[in-house]
């Protein structure tokens, strides 16, 4: 294990002593270090009244247990302190470590022994993670060290799990949104699931905007998957024009209906464990699925500002600007008198996407977004550079398929009877607007692009994204992060996994960092927490995270791709075409081994380089036809240790998110030998070779010069590594599977790869 600690907030000795005493630790700067150590260890093991037994179970060094040491006149040394400290943090001598100081060095242990300020070491220990994924103070509180009395308690600038999760209020209200997306003449009502502790304190809110949470129509969506086999469309030369999107909300009339408590309750909802963590620390949880979902009104508009407005309306209700009702009858109002109105949003993928969209409305009470694997432009999710491009792992999906999946109103049979005909009519119109024929950008996609609205963001922004996420690709976060206003606070965690959460990883204290941030922004705690702008996981070594100031570099290194002209044949024999169409994994396997129709260039790396940003291909090429599709991937090629894409379980149920509440597994990305690693990739319609809004003719056998930006990356290359640049046409996982008979010729002597380096 290596420590990468970002959540700890440095403090003075006097403040540390004050906070320790407030927690009940009976230590004092007037006592000796050994006396304080005995007291501290006794209280850490508060469940066991036999302290002599506790002391005998811990060693001070390889020859002495703690009981013997405490009764001796030996001095408390650095080695003894570290040996004891590691045991308090759940590391086992002779199994996890032999010599404490060696382990401390290799694990980047964040505590320096300070015999003159020893109380500070106890304070730091409580704020440091154990081997099993919780800080020591969180572990103690989870075991009952502090009562769950529904009052806020803080340590090191973070809220502690002192809220009773065994007696939670679970209620449902229906918020009136300024929308009529199903065109039935009534404002849409939005179902809101609320989970909150029973307390007199005014609670902030952690909200997850999830179109999935009221259920999904998986069978219906599967039936709508598109066939990917077909011919690449030859488009007419043109310039595409779009207009700025300006969503216009409807008027919501004021109401003087009777006020009532919420009347509808629920017993269970599929919660997000990061939300559970905050729930136990005095943050109400809200789950809302928005328009077009089960028990709400409206049509599933899939990514536009009408959908976002349905989530914004919930924040408006929390702050008294719109009405919530007890039911669809709209006869009694419910007031959000239990909240301070301040909101943070959480969630991954579609959920994180809605966080970004919400932030671009500039709503002032949205103080923090924690957006993980989030989309910033829906065009770039379902299209790329003038091509229909399925999300990685989901061939044949498009936004109409997502609409069918998330329009969960049809899961309620009565709603289906009353509203399915109107839904089918509106879905058919959406299908026309998405334009699968050309793959071009249009007004539909402009209305689902949050980048032009990034300047309106006022919230404190936290993004996480996997650099191996080929579902929501890295450009999504690269573009939005670099479009954020200079004056706001922003951070990004870039990990080496794919489309995954990272709050329960061993190597980084993400969960605790978010606690410090939300305690400051939503609870008003003046903790002076500072988080680096960019925190990224170094791909070249295990459990190592580093800091950067920028995602993307203007400094580049350029390399020639060769000296000859090479051919990419688009056409495959029918047996190969069928094999690859039936199993895109077989295609990827052959592609990386130079067995597909491709040009593969191996480029030796002569010095260490940190790739930071978008690798660019400058190519001179021609097509034998009046069309052409170009795909590219850049690999770190050759057998060596690399991260796997998915985290694996290190310890089951070792993380307690409260006091015996919402336990989850500790995870980490495995680091093991592999033959290659994808650094970046991209696809391009050669008719869109200049830019997205310009469609140009391709003249057969006429040379073209193109610049092709691939997906953004942060990747450490080392001297002796080898880059493999793969150029090909059809990508059987993501693009149209066109088996027509044409070739691309690339003049490698006039082609280069341009690598941005930090």
UniProtKB/Swiss-Prot annotation:
Q: Which catalytic reaction applies to this protein?
A: Hydrolyzes Xaa-Pro-|- bonds to release unblocked, N-terminal dipeptides from substrates including Ala-Pro-|-p-nitroanilide and (sequentially) Tyr-Pro-|-Phe-Pro-|-Gly-Pro-|-Ile
- Recorded GO CC terms: cytoplasm
| Residue spans crossing the bilayer | none
Subunit structure, per the record? Homodimer.
- Tell me where it resides: Cytoplasm
- Taxonomy of the source species: Bacteria, Bacillati, Bacillota, Bacilli, Lactobacillales
PANTHER family tied to this protein: COCE_NOND FAMILY, PUTATIVE (AFU_ORTHOLOGUE AFUA_7G00600)-RELATED, PEPTIDASE S9 PROLYL OLIGOPEPTIDASE
Tell me the gene name. Answer: pepX
Which Gene3D superfamilies does the record match to this protein? 1.10.246.70, alpha/beta hydrolase, Galactose-binding domain-like
Instruction: Write the Enzyme Commission number(s) for this entry.
Output: 3.4.14.11
What is the name of this protein? Xaa-Pro dipeptidyl-peptidase
Q: What does the UniProt record say this protein does?
A: Removes N-terminal dipeptides sequentially from polypeptides having unsubstituted N-termini provided that the penultimate residue is proline.
InterPro entries per the UniProt record, alphabetical: AB_hydrolase_fold, Galactose-bd-like_sf, Pept_S15_Xpro, PepX_N_dom, PepX_N_dom_sf, Xaa-Pro-like_dom, Xaa-Pro_dipept_C, Xaa-Pro_dipeptidyl-ppase/CocE
* Active site positions: 349 (charge relay system), 469 (charge relay system), 499 (charge relay system)
| Taxonomy, superkingdom | Bacteria
Pfam families listed in its UniProt record: Peptidase_S15, PepX_C, PepX_N
- One of the record's GO molecular function terms: dipeptidyl-peptidase activity
């Amino acid at each position: 294990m290596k420590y990468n600690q970002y959540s700890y907030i440095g403090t003075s000795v006097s403040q540390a002593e004050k906070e320790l005493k407030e927690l009940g630790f009976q230590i004092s700067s007037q006592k000796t270090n050994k006396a304080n150590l005995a007291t501290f260890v006794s209280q850490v093991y508060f469940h066991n009244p036999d302290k002599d037994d506790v002391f005998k179970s811990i060693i001070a060094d390889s020859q002495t247990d703690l009981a013997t040491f405490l009764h001796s006149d030996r001095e408390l040394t650095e080695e003894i302190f570290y040996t004891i400290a590691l045991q308090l943090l759940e590391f086992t001598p002779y199994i996890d470590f032999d010599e404490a100081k060696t382990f401390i060095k290799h694990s980047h242990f964040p505590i320096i022994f300070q015999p003159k300020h020893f109380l500070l070491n106890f304070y730091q220990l409580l704020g440091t993670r154990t081997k099993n994924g919780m800080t020591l103070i969180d572990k103690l509180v989870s075991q009952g060290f502090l009562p769950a009395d529904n009052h806020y308690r803080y340590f090191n600038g973070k809220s502690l799990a002192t809220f009773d999760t065994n007696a939670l209020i679970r209620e449902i209200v229906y918020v009136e949104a300024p929308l009529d997306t199903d065109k039935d003449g009534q404002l849409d009502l939005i179902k809101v699931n609320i989970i909150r502790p029973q307390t007199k304190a005014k609670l902030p809110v952690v909200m997850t905007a999830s179109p999935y949470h009221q259920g999904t129509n998986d069978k219906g969506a599967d039936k709508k998957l598109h066939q990917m086999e077909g011919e690449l469309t030859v488009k007419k030369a043109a310039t595409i024009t779009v207009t700025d999107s300006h969503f216009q909300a409807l008027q919501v009339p004021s109401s003087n209906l009777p006020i009532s408590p919420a009347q509808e309750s629920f017993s269970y909802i599929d919660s997000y464990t990061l939300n559970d963590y905050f729930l136990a620390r005095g943050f109400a949880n809200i789950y809302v699925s928005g328009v077009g979902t089960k028990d709400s009104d409206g049509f599933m508009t899939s990514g536009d500002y009408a959908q976002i407005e349905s989530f914004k309306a919930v924040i408006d209700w929390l702050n008294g600007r719109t009405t919530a009702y007890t039911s669809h009858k709209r006869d009694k109002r419910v007031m959000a008198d239990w909240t301070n109105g301040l909101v943070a949003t959480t969630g991954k993928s579609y959920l994180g996407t809605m966080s970004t969209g919400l932030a671009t409305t500039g709503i002032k009470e949205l103080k923090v977004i924690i957006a993980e694997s989030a989309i910033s432009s829906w065009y770039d999710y379902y299209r790329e550079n003038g091509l229909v491009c399925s999300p990685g792992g989901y061939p044949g999906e498009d936004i109409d398929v997502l609409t069918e999946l998330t329009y969960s109103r049809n899961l309620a049979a009565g709603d289906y009877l009353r509203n399915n005909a109107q839904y089918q009519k509106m879905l058919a119109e959406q299908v026309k607007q998405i334009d699968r024929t050309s793959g071009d950008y249009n007004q539909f996609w402009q209305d689902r692009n949050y980048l032009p609205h990034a300047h309106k963001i006022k919230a404190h922004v936290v993004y996480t994204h996997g650099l191996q996420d080929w579902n929501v690709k890295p450009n999504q976060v690269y573009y939005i992060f670099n479009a954020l206003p200079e004056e706001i606070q922003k951070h990004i965690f870039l990990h080496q996994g794919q489309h995954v959460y990272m709050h329960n990883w061993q190597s980084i204290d993400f969960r605790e960092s978010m606690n410090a941030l939300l305690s400051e922004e939503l609870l008003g705690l003046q903790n002076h927490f500072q988080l680096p702008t960019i925190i990224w996981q170094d791909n070249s070594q295990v459990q190592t995270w580093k800091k950067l100031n920028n995602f993307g570099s203007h400094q580049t290194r350029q390399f020639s791709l060769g000296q000859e002209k090479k051919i990419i044949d688009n056409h495959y024999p029918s047996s190969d075409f069928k094999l690859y169409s039936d199993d895109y994994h077989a295609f990827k396997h052959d592609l990386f081994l130079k067995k597909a129709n491709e040009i593969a260039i191996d480029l030796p790396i002569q010095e260490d380089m940190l790739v930071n940003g978008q690798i660019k291909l400058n190519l001179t090429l021609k097509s034998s036809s009046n069309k052409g599709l170009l795909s590219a991937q850049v690999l770190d090629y050759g057998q060596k240790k690399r991260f796997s894409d998915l985290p694996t379980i290190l310890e089951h149920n070792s993380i307690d998110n409260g006091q015996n509440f919402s336990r989850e597994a500790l995870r980490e990305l495995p680091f093991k030998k592999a033959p290659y690693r994808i650094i970046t990739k991209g696809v391009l319609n050669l008719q869109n070779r200049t830019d997205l809004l310009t469609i140009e003719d391709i003249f057969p056998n006429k040379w073209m010069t193109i610049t092709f930006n691939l997906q953004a990356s942060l990747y450490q290359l080392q001297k002796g590594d080898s880059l493999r640049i793969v150029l090909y046409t059809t990508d059987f996982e993501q693009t149209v599977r066109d088996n027509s008979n044409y070739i691309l010729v690339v003049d490698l002597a006039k082609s280069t790869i341009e690598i941005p380096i930090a």
